[in-house]
Amino acid sequence: SESYPIDCEAFMKDNSGKYVKYLWDPNSYINIMVYNFTTEPNSNSVTLGISHIPFSTTGKHYLEGLGETDYSHLTLANLQFPLCVSINSLYINEESTPTEYSTADIVVTLAHELGHYLGLHHVFAETDNGTCEDTDYCKDTKRYNKQEYDSNCDYIYENEREKYTFKNLVKRTGCDGIEFISYNIMDYAISYSN
């Protein structure tokens, strides 16, 4: 039996084919599902959205970092999982104002998740060992260690509250050691893109 709220990870990873009936033709539409996501009782984080990364055709036009397929045209019959973007309905009305920044801004969340759906990865290094590597497959984007950034933000919040400002929080130290300001929608930490 189905339950509500819905576990977004389980929904997105479901390979039984039972959710494909909710999709429209993936060659003509981007399917966006809006529902209440379950939350872990002891978690301090909230999932605002989640998306599938697209497929790339096998062969000379394959794009690194994407799932490979032999199909150049997907049909619903080719799918066993819900190829879509999922948005947490609890935050559907959240938005920033000219004077107040909201980390749950629906416009930013949707733009970010659509970026994933179209093949973009996070700009920060996503490694289990905390190393600063290029994991977004785009050589021209500045990358940084997000674990280190988050630790620095926590430290500033706890010990130097006067420095906990938007102007300071958009700054990053790149993997090359050079400071830069984040303007990239695929960086879901505080950024001018948001």
Residue spans of the language-model regions?
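Metzincin-family zinc-dependent endopeptidase catalytic domain
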Residues: 1-156
